[in-house]
Amino acid sequence: MRLPWELLVLQSFMLCLADDYTLHGPVFVQEPSHVMFPLDSEEKKVKLSCEVKGNPKPHIRWKINGTDVDIGMDFRYSVVDGSLLINNPNKTQDAGTYQCIATNSFGTIVSREAKLQFAYLENFKTRTRSTVSVRRGQGMVLLCGPPPHSGELSYAWIFNEYPSYQDNRRFVSQETGNLYIAKVEKSDVGNYTCVVTNTVTNHKVLGPPTPLILRNDGVMGEYEPKIEVQFPETVPAEKGTTVKLECFALGNPVPTILWRRADGKPIARKARRHKSNGILEIPNFQQEDAGSYECVAENSRGKNVAKGQLTFYAQPNWVQIINDIHVAMEESVFWECKANGRPKPTYRWLKNGDPLLTRDRIQIEQGTLNITIVNLSDAGMYQCVAENKHGVIFSSAELSVIAESPDFSRTLLKRVTLVKVGGEVVIECKPKASPRPVYTWRKGREILRENERITISEDGNLRIINVTKSDAGSYTCIATNHFGTASSTGNVIVKDPTKVMVPPSSMDVTVGESIVLPCQVTHDHSLDIVFTWTFNGHLIDFDKDGDHFERVGGQDSAGDLMIRNIQLKHAGKYVCMVQTSVDKLSVAADLIVRGPPGPPEAVTIDEITDTTAQLSWRPGPDNHSPITMYVIQARTPFSVGWQAVNTVPDLVDGKTFTATVVGLNPWVEYEFRTVAANVIGIGEPSRPSEKRRTEEALPEVTPANVSGGGGSKSELVITWETVPEELQNGRGFGYVVAFRPHGKMIWMLTVLASADASRYVFRNESVRPFSPFEVKVGVFNNKGEGPFSPTTLVYSAEEEPTKPPASIFARSLSATDIEVFWASPIGKNRGRIQGYEVKYWRHDDKEENAKKIRTVGNQTSTKITNLKGSALYHLSVKAYNSAGTGPSSATVNVTTRKPPPSQPPGNIIWNSSDSKIILNWDQVKALDNESEVKGYKVLYRWNRQSSTSVIETNKTSVELSLPFDEDYIIEIKPFSDGGDGSSSEQIRIPKISNSYARGSGASTSNACTLSAISTIMISLTARSSL
């Protein structure tokens, strides 16, 4: 067997082999849990799980009821990957409490305890039961008496071979299995059988039937409830579980069940009630659910109460566990574990599976363990055990004691340490060593002695203050403990300090200006130097804020800052920070920025009338330039943004903080703001004042564009533009309409009490058509009447024409166009004529779907287009005016011409010579339903122009003279009485050269260039049209 120190040396050696091969004590991955094993299980095998990791691999053994399980002596036992397997388990031999014990070279840990129990359910011993005889109306209890068993049971009853259902009369207790009938009725007579089920094995057994009969000696009278099923006086309940309380009473009439808490608190909302309130179920039981509960059974004869106390308990639960500790020799170890539980847990400690007691260097107090002056024998596996009467929990940790000589291999002294003259330097010395070593220092070959400048700390660090050039050199730290000595050497280089030669100075500038803040230094040129600037404590980002900030200077000893287009937000403290690898320093300057004033504050409406408002405010910041004036602005729901307003005084100087706004509109909601100005500019506006409405006043603005006319017979229609709301001057705004026949003296008046009214119709049979009236419209509101608008002349409604147009005639112009003619109505016509309305429809369409077109004035003909070819159309004409249309003329008929040819000219061939183009094409023949071809139209234009010229010919060829060089686009289409037919594809003819050229419409890729022309000569008989 190795000594403890040998194990420690071996452990230290193995730790160095590989980072991914860490040696450690056993750690439980999975601990055994309680097992309820069904005796009738087909598997015939029990597994108690235990999984452990550790390096070296731990050895696993098991205990039952505190005694080692001898795997070799009983073939039924085997351990597979740490778990215990029991073949053909026996409830007599194998039931008990098991623990898993894991051990490797670092120590031993024990698992939590796990109980192995066996679930079974035997058959009922008796086969028959005595008959139960009861009176009608009497309460009854049928006993179940379950047979021997292990494991939780559930109960049900069968009544005459059918399941007995539960209601407010019947109740089956899941605690006793008994069947309770609160009040027996005739329908309850029969055989009752108790059914018992083991919830673990699902095995079910039936008890012997119990016959129930009714007695013949009368009926049971009414009586108060008698509680037969009630919960115990004390019911312990575990945290987080579901608690069920049962309560049922016999009685006549059938009692009702009510639950309540004795302390008056409401039962938790999560609680549920089942079986006609016979069961109170509380899920996820917590401390606040504990207390005294009452079951109240009540009927018309009285009530009874059953009481019981629900007590709360909780198994221990870790709040703070212990963790592995690696400690050097002669140091101390302190562990603390904490657990919650009800009742409060007690603590004990184990080392390598054995109890640990207080002695000498080891102090144990509840959940704390303190070991002083640690040595190698203290290494091992430790466990804190917390327990109460409801459970036990374990927390494990490993204590490693490190013993090694000083080693600098991973913590060498810094090779070079830079320091400035007059500065301070600390050289760290942190070798790995256990126990802590003793430190000495050398400079070169001389041992360093501590003095007022040189000190050596307890942890070995060397500190030198007020450094001089003579302190440069090599320094060696020597560490020594019981196991050996080691050293490490580093060099100190002393540099000249950095000094600021031209610092930035505080400045006073105006918005928009640009400045440079200097920052120039002298420094040791063997060191790199870095300049940084902060503004009000924040680092300036020259990339993000490059619009305003830029580093300038160009020399490594200058870090000047340029600030361009300075704004108010740039006022504040600027700090230049200079840093080298040996020192850093900073210098600061304040920048004051003068600019337009800030917004005034607390704009208040002190008094308001119908047209004025008295304002006051407090001045805002003047931004280092005195305020010279204030401007008042106002806004209403009707204005476009903020508008400057007139004030008294006219100009509000910078020392005045009140003003009267004049020229306001009455009964309008206003809000005001103030803008300050100084010699630099106009500042930001203040926040708006509260909204206030001016007082009411008489209206002053009259309606605009008073006019009218039109309407129906015997009507005078008067219209006007409404007065805008902001000019109505008060509530109750409306209009007064005044009118009289032209030349009369007496006005007729009508009042319209609506601000939105814009039209009035006077209807009277005495009103003659198209009679002149003098009209004016006035205004009023709740304050009184305002002025009237100027008088204007309005005509009454006219009468629609009374005579139809005469001499209606229509003719066809083409397949799509017809022309209609008519004459003015004959005889005296009472209504004036403003124009005519032509109605037309195709013979195949209905007249109500007819289309209409109108003419204006005295025009007595019109052209109708976009018609269908070869179609019969019906037409009629009416005269119209503002009153409507007059009677219709007689209907006339006209048929459009056949459609023009649909076939375009084909086989177009052209050739050119001596500035002439000759075109030839095939004759177009019309179809039977098309108009005969009368000739052809040749359309041509310059390639770069949109205007087109047209040549008509009755032949199938044409000759063009084109004196200028230009590309041409040419099309050809036939025409007939029905109109123009389909056009050929466009032909592009390029510029004409002296050489002979030719081409065809089928292919324009051979086309030659044509010259632009100003005159076209046709060599054959044709007529030209534009």
Swiss-Prot record:
<dbReference type="Pfam" id="PF00041">
    <property type="entry name" value="fn3"/>
</dbReference>
<feature type="disulfide bond">
    <location>
        <begin position="429"/>
        <end position="477"/>
    </location>
</feature>
<dbReference type="InterPro" id="IPR013783">
    <property type="entry name" value="Ig-like_fold"/>
</dbReference>
<feature type="domain" description="Fibronectin type-III 4">
    <location>
        <begin position="900"/>
        <end position="995"/>
    </location>
</feature>
<dbReference type="InterPro" id="IPR003961">
    <property type="entry name" value="FN3_dom"/>
</dbReference>
<feature type="glycosylation site" description="N-linked (GlcNAc...) asparagine">
    <location>
        <position position="90"/>
    </location>
</feature>
<feature type="glycosylation site" description="N-linked (GlcNAc...) asparagine">
    <location>
        <position position="929"/>
    </location>
</feature>
<dbReference type="GO" id="GO:0007155">
    <property type="term" value="P:cell adhesion"/>
</dbReference>
<keyword id="KW-0393">Immunoglobulin domain</keyword>
<feature type="domain" description="Ig-like C2-type 5">
    <location>
        <begin position="406"/>
        <end position="493"/>
    </location>
</feature>
<dbReference type="GO" id="GO:0007399">
    <property type="term" value="P:nervous system development"/>
</dbReference>
<keyword id="KW-0472">Membrane</keyword>
<keyword id="KW-0732">Signal</keyword>
<feature type="signal peptide">
    <location>
        <begin position="1"/>
        <end position="18"/>
    </location>
</feature>
<feature type="propeptide" description="Removed in mature form">
    <location>
        <begin position="1001"/>
        <end position="1026"/>
    </location>
</feature>
<feature type="disulfide bond">
    <location>
        <begin position="50"/>
        <end position="100"/>
    </location>
</feature>
<keyword id="KW-0677">Repeat</keyword>
<dbReference type="InterPro" id="IPR033007">
    <property type="entry name" value="CNTN4_Ig6"/>
</dbReference>
<keyword id="KW-0130">Cell adhesion</keyword>
<feature type="glycosylation site" description="N-linked (GlcNAc...) asparagine">
    <location>
        <position position="370"/>
    </location>
</feature>
<feature type="region of interest" description="Disordered">
    <location>
        <begin position="685"/>
        <end position="710"/>
    </location>
</feature>
<feature type="glycosylation site" description="N-linked (GlcNAc...) asparagine">
    <location>
        <position position="764"/>
    </location>
</feature>
<dbReference type="Pfam" id="PF13927">
    <property type="entry name" value="Ig_3"/>
</dbReference>
<keyword id="KW-0336">GPI-anchor</keyword>
<keyword id="KW-1003">Cell membrane</keyword>
<comment type="function">
    <text>Contactins mediate cell surface interactions during nervous system development. Has some neurite outgrowth-promoting activity. May be involved in synaptogenesis.</text>
</comment>
<feature type="disulfide bond">
    <location>
        <begin position="144"/>
        <end position="194"/>
    </location>
</feature>
<feature type="lipid moiety-binding region" description="GPI-anchor amidated serine">
    <location>
        <position position="1000"/>
    </location>
</feature>
<feature type="disulfide bond">
    <location>
        <begin position="337"/>
        <end position="384"/>
    </location>
</feature>
<feature type="glycosylation site" description="N-linked (GlcNAc...) asparagine">
    <location>
        <position position="911"/>
    </location>
</feature>
<feature type="glycosylation site" description="N-linked (GlcNAc...) asparagine">
    <location>
        <position position="893"/>
    </location>
</feature>
<feature type="disulfide bond">
    <location>
        <begin position="519"/>
        <end position="576"/>
    </location>
</feature>
<dbReference type="GO" id="GO:0045665">
    <property type="term" value="P:negative regulation of neuron differentiation"/>
</dbReference>
<comment type="subunit">
    <text>Interacts with PTPRG.</text>
</comment>
<feature type="glycosylation site" description="N-linked (GlcNAc...) asparagine">
    <location>
        <position position="191"/>
    </location>
</feature>
<dbReference type="InterPro" id="IPR036179">
    <property type="entry name" value="Ig-like_dom_sf"/>
</dbReference>
<feature type="compositionally biased region" description="Polar residues">
    <location>
        <begin position="886"/>
        <end position="896"/>
    </location>
</feature>
<feature type="domain" description="Ig-like C2-type 2">
    <location>
        <begin position="122"/>
        <end position="207"/>
    </location>
</feature>
<feature type="region of interest" description="Disordered">
    <location>
        <begin position="886"/>
        <end position="906"/>
    </location>
</feature>
<feature type="compositionally biased region" description="Basic and acidic residues">
    <location>
        <begin position="687"/>
        <end position="696"/>
    </location>
</feature>
<dbReference type="GO" id="GO:0031175">
    <property type="term" value="P:neuron projection development"/>
</dbReference>
<keyword id="KW-0964">Secreted</keyword>
